[in-house]
């Protein structure tokens, strides 16, 4: 008899925990979706653009914002300005001039990330041109 009561109590407790966990997961998913929508609205990016940006950040190990800060450039991006700042910082941080390989690597990675962004911008412009050509 006591085992039966203990089993009922354990099952009731397990059921309550399962319901609470399910509700918490549902709430977390809803909040994540709302946060993604707010981020997309504030940046003006679609969900796929945000995903592409996150993939680029993960692949290269550096965010676009960090890259812009390292090379001291602002948006909208200008290739000549980026190249000028990159050359200057890369040469200044040369080991023979008292720089370090670490800093040169950071400058190189920042340029690499910005180049990736230039590629995405060009791809977007090409798609836009193709769509305009199809509609005409």
From Swiss-Prot:
Keyword Endoplasmic reticulum belongs to the record: no
Q: Which domain of life is it from?
A: Eukaryota
Q: Where in the cell is it found?
A: Mitochondrion inner membrane
J-like as annotated region, ranges: 66-119
- Report whether Protein transport shows up as a keyword of the record: yes
Q: Where is this region: Disordered?
A: 32-58
Provide the GO biological process annotations. Answer: protein import into mitochondrial matrix
Give the record's membrane topology.
Peripheral membrane protein
Q: Which InterPro entries match?
A: J_dom_sf, Tim16
Q: Which GO terms describe its cellular component?
A: TIM23 mitochondrial import inner membrane translocase complex
- Please state the protein's primary subcellular location: mitochondrion
Record Pfam families? Pam16 (PF03656)
Q: Which Gene3D superfamilies match?
A: DnaJ domain
Bias kind Polar residues: ranges:
42-58
Tell me the keywords, alphabetical order: Membrane, Mitochondrion, Mitochondrion inner membrane, Protein transport, Translocation, Transport
Partners and quaternary state? Answer: Probable component of the PAM complex at least composed of a mitochondrial HSP70 protein, GrpE, tim-44, tim-16 and dnj-21/tim-14. Associates with the TIM23 complex.
Any idea what job this protein has?
Regulates ATP-dependent protein translocation into the mitochondrial matrix.
Q: What is known of its domains?
A: The J-like region, although related to the J domain does not have co-chaperone activity.
The UniProt family comment states:
Belongs to the TIM16/PAM16 family.
Q: What is this protein called?
A: Mitochondrial import inner membrane translocase subunit tim-16
């Amino acid at each position: 008899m006591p085992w039966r009561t203990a089993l009922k109590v354990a099952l009731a407790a397990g059921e309550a925990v399962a319901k609470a966990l399910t509700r918490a997961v549902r709430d977390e998913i809803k909040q994540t979706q709302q946060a993604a929508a707010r981020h997309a609205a504030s940046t003006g990016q679609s969900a796929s653009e945000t995903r592409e940006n996150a993939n680029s950040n993960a692949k290269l190990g550096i965010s676009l914002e960090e890259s812009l800060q390292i090379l001291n450039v602002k948006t909208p991006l200008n290739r000549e300005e980026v190249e000028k700042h990159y050359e200057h910082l890369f040469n200044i941080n040369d080991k023979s001039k008292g720089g370090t390989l670490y800093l040169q690597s950071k400058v190189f990675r920042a340029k690499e990330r910005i180049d990736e962004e230039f590629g995405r911008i060009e791809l977007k412009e090409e798609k836009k041109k193709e769509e305009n050509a199809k509609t005409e």
